[in-house]
Amino acid sequence: MASKGTGMSFSRKSYRLTSDAEKSRVTGIVQEKLLSDYLYRIFSPPDRGPAAATSRKPLNFHNLPEHVDQLLQVDSEDNESQGQVEGRLGPSTVVLDHTGGFEGLLLVDDDLLGVIGHSNFGTIRSTTCVYKGKWVYEVLISSQGLMQIGWCTINCRFNQEEGVGDTHNSYAYDGNRVRKWNVTTTNYGKAWAAGDIVSCLIDLDDGTLSFCLNGVSLGTAFENLSRGLGMAYFPAISLSFKESVAFNFGSRPLRYPVAGFRPLQDPPFADLVRAQRLLGCFQAVLSVELDPVEGRLVETESSEWQLQGQPTVLLTLAHIFHHFAPLLRKVYLVEAVLMSFLLGVVEKGTPEQAQSVVHQILDLLWLFMEDYEVQDCLKQLMMSLLRLYRFSPIVPDLGLQIHYLRLTMSILRHEKSRKFLLSNVLFDMLRSVVFFYIKSPLRVEEAGLKELIPTTWWPHRSSRESRDGKEAREETTEERQRRRAYERGCQRLKKRIEVVEELQVQILKLLLDNKDDNGGEASRYIFLTKFRKFLQENASGRGNTPVLCPPEYMVCFLHRLVSALRFYWDEYKASNPRASFSEEAYIPPQIFYNGKVDYFDLQRLGGLLSHLRKTLKDDLASKANIVIDPLELQAATMDDLDEDEEPAPSAAQRPMQALAIGGALPLPRPGWLSSPTLGRANRFLSTAAVSLMTPRRLLSTMEKVKVRSLNVEQRTREDIEGSHWNEGLLLGRPPEEPEQPLTENSLLEVLDGTVMMYNLSVHQQLGKMVGVSDDVNEYAMALRDTEDKLRRCPKRRKDILAELTKSQKVFSEKLDHLSRRLAWVHATVYSQEKMLDIYWLLRVCLRTIEHGDRTGSLFAFMPEFYLSVAINSYSALKNYFGPVHSMEELPGYEETLTRLAAILAKHFADPRIVGTDIRDSLMQALASYVCYPHSLRAVERIPEEQRIAMVRNLLAPYEQRPWAQTNWILVRLWRGCGFGYRYTRLPHLLKTKPEDANLPSLQKPCPSTLLQQHMADLLRQGSDVAPSFLNSVLNQLNWAFSEFIGMIQEIQQAAERLERNFVDSRQLKVCATCFDLSVSLLRVLEMTITLVPEIFLDWSRPTSEMLLRRLAQLLNQVLNRVTAERNLFDRVVTLRLPGLESVDHYPILVAVTGILVRLLVHGPTSETEQATSVLLADPCFQLRSICYLLGQPEPLAPGTTLPAPDRKRFSLQSYTDYISAEELAQVEQMLAHLTAASAQAAAASLPTNEEDLCPICYAHPISAVFQPCGHKSCKACINQHLMNNKDCFFCKATIVSVEDWDKAANTSAMSSAA
């Protein structure tokens, strides 16, 4: 428009407005008298109104500069320029003294006002001290950990153990421990939280020192301070590791100024007065309009002002900004003047009016200020906004947060300002994710939660008790009314929080706008670059604390990002019918291998990226039409090898070759790629060339065109979204993927980053926040116990009644506080909407994994975190959100459960997945999955071939792989079917304090007969499956039980020593683990014998006899060790050492009994006789061990009576709640059978010559000879040996065959030959 050209002529590039000729020409636009009145109205001194028209000199643009200079003259400027003030020593600009020898112990920000602890207890002080007068400074608490804030003298000496307040003449307040410190310590003040502001006040006239928290005085902390010669006090702080604060000595306006106290750094008084007067002039322009027709001034509302390009107004604004622009670069003036003005604009009028005014103000800033000036101004403005938002107290209506967010949104709606802030400020200079965080109040009273939730309530029965199956107590009318009142209060709170959340989502929608591409890249593509770099810093810098975004910010950022992302996804679907809804979202698999998205140094499922590109280059060419240049691949490999040794300069100077369509495109290597932590991050993008062939069509060699994935920092809209010749992010589509796009490619990258963000820290934080709910349950249980004691306490014991009443009051007050805090946590973290966000991410990951799996070997390129997020998000929904909202109510819950079950069942033994950690996670997830009825039924619903494949993997031999979790899965499938195996907790642990009932190991038995049947079928069908599996189980049982016995021998010896000694808790834990493994292996054997008894009892099978003999040998060893009176096992069990709680007679003996009963009682007579003969033939068999099961020390002879025991004996008959009468009858039948059989075997046994015994076991006669070496042993020993080794036991010669050996026949043959 014409006015814009006129306004642009008044550029400040040379700080010269216009020529005199131009001025006289322009002033003729309006009547001279009207112009004079207008200028006097705009540039009136603030202390008096406009002078009478008759007594003033006419004012025009010619003499206006002199008038403005006079207006901006400040009388006290000379006094302020002196710098030194009585009572203060040091530089006028107060900062932290980073030269005091604290290097390495603390990390100080560039502005020397922020500090982060980097040692055990580091201390730092300011550069300025005070010795007289009243002074104050503020500390912005960024983390609520251990810190001591206060004052010290120059003679105080600190170290890693002693900080501010630990020496004489140093004084400190510690809000973490709620104490004050001066050599000694006493209670003082209130607890602080992240986002609070502590004001430190010192009155050296009265010799007192006090503190304020968020403007509220905590009272006098110290009196009678040492004063006089040589006594001057420095602001100082001591911080523990990772704690962080920021100081405000007066460089910015104090948030909570205290009357009579002066900041250590004086405000820029003269500039402040000038800026306020200029702001008044600017406001006058907004509220006064010229009416040239009527020749008068019209007063209007500033909220309705419109920039219409009037030359007189533009000239007036040019004169204002000529003086105003340099002032708006100073942080103090931006916060004190411009920020206050803009907040006032936002608070007045409607949001639309405020938005219009702010938008026009920003237009004026960009019009009348130099670019570097407006950029500095916007930078300071956003940093001030961030501080105001982050360190504002929580008020009942969240009004402060709403105002700051509305102003932030108004600024970001201005396109030019938004793009500048996105490119240079939001992610580069400050943590913009703070704008999406809603802090949790530590002090619910100050947050107004008492008024918002006047009635508190908490569950009167914990989730732990409900899972234990205890009957729910009927809810009384009073409890029901309290619960409903509490829920109404929670809803009121949630609605207020939703207002803030909606503003945050609107801000993110502005940042994700991709239609504002006038004059540069759209905001979304700038955001993508910064967002990826943000993820890189948090993924690659996990050991570098200052760079990491706090996880509580990440949680809120993730939820707002999901809302904005789904909005744009569904908006695109509305205009593109072939696209998909956000409910069907997933990440196409080609993004993982085409190099268009940077995954830094994150692990892939198949291992290192360089290894995958070498081994799978043929598959990339055939399935995705991507060809890897061998020379570039070799260069990338060598570059990986030399990376650690290569100096940074040479890395930065190394040329990066890139070939694009049309020829070579040299791209310089960005400097940040050369840093040690980030050097490996973009190796795929920076050194390897990718060749592209047109998708879905085989091309000749000449048609293959080498292309290069652009670096993340250099990508454009075309690089991401693609064009008619370029698929963008979707380069290299495999044949399994549909041709139509899901959505815009940029949204796919945002979704990928969101999944990565959940994996980085969100899941961990969700688990931490459950602690509030756990605290409520603990205190509720304590309150119930106290009330029960009060009811039972005799009235005559008034002393006990008084103590119980006091405890009841403490618990009730704590529960009131915690229940209100829990309402806040549920509204901000565990609400239904947040649950749906996590559920959506779970489904996204499931679909992504399913699509990636269809690509075959290319599945190995998928980053590990997709599987991790799928596992962890389900765990979060079940364990963190489950107590508040039911998972069963989620849409498509059953289908999702089944799809996750199919993924776990297929990939826990997937050879394409090589990472040990992710394989363990998959195994543990599957083990947990089969413990719960709902998820176990989901496993049973997956296709039959997948179920059979899963069971086949579970039955693979245990050697050469982690087997404990596999065995645990098989045990859970059997639990509830075994002998005496229907317990949830062991009988001897019932009286102890219950553990978390949500643990997988404490779930009620839920066996799967379907999966048991699959196991039986596989063991029957495969000739090699059963022997190899059972051989490995028997080997591991032998190892686990032997290790257990060896360890309890050491524990027993240590316990019997006279001198004081301690048993290592780790040794106790390993010992208990070996015992648990032994029990679980016995249960797997019991399941196998029950389901497929012929494996042991059908001696037509070549390995049955050998397996049965080995089983009998192990069972006898276990029985002998466990059942002997007052033996090693017995003594250790009676010690009841902490850590060995699970070690007891019952679990291991009932497992052995179940195996024996199945062998000796069930089945046809021929099979039981075979099992009996093998059991009795084992030299370790003792009938006494079998008698022990029923509490009988020895079999009774006729006519004798059982002697009176001197102590309680173990007996299965004592566990009637766990063992049925039918099972006990079977044990008695087995004992009778073995008693009779052992008597017959003893009568029929003949003495054996020692020379004829097997030289390996010395238990059985020699019955086999090895060929060709001729050594001999019994068949059982050699068969067992050959299961694992083909070399001779004696001479290590290779055994070709084993032949029967009969001494009598061979002796007669030798005699005949002689």
UniProtKB/Swiss-Prot annotation:
The modification Phosphoserine is found at residue 675. The keyword Ribonucleoprotein does not apply. Residues 74-254 form the B30.2/SPRY domain. Pathway: Protein modification; protein ubiquitination. Zn(2+) 1 binds at residues 1254, 1257, 1274, 1277. Gene3D superfamilies: 2.60.120.920, Zinc/RING finger domain, C3HC4 (zinc finger). Ubiquitinated, leading to its degradation. Deubiquitinated by USP19, thereby stimulating CDKN1B ubiquitin-dependent degradation. It holds the Pfam family SPRY. It catalyses: S-ubiquitinyl-[E2 ubiquitin-conjugating enzyme]-L-cysteine + [acceptor protein]-L-lysine = [E2 ubiquitin-conjugating enzyme]-L-cysteine + N(6)-ubiquitinyl-[acceptor protein]-L-lysine. CDD domains: RING-HC_RNF123 (cd16541), SPRY_RNF123 (cd12882). The modification Asymmetric dimethylarginine is found at residue 683. One of its GO terms (biological process) is protein maturation. GO terms for cellular component: cytoplasm; cytosol; nuclear membrane. Catalytic subunit of the KPC complex that acts as E3 ubiquitin-protein ligase. Promotes the ubiquitination and proteasome-mediated degradation of CDKN1B which is the cyclin-dependent kinase inhibitor at the G0-G1 transition of the cell cycle. Also acts as a key regulator of the NF-kappa-B signaling by promoting maturation of the NFKB1 component of NF-kappa-B: acts by catalyzing ubiquitination of the NFKB1 p105 precursor, leading to limited proteasomal degradation of NFKB1 p105 and generation of the active NFKB1 p50 subunit. This is E3 ubiquitin-protein ligase RNF123. It comes from Mus musculus (Mouse). The lineage of its organism: Eukaryota, Metazoa, Chordata, Craniata, Vertebrata.
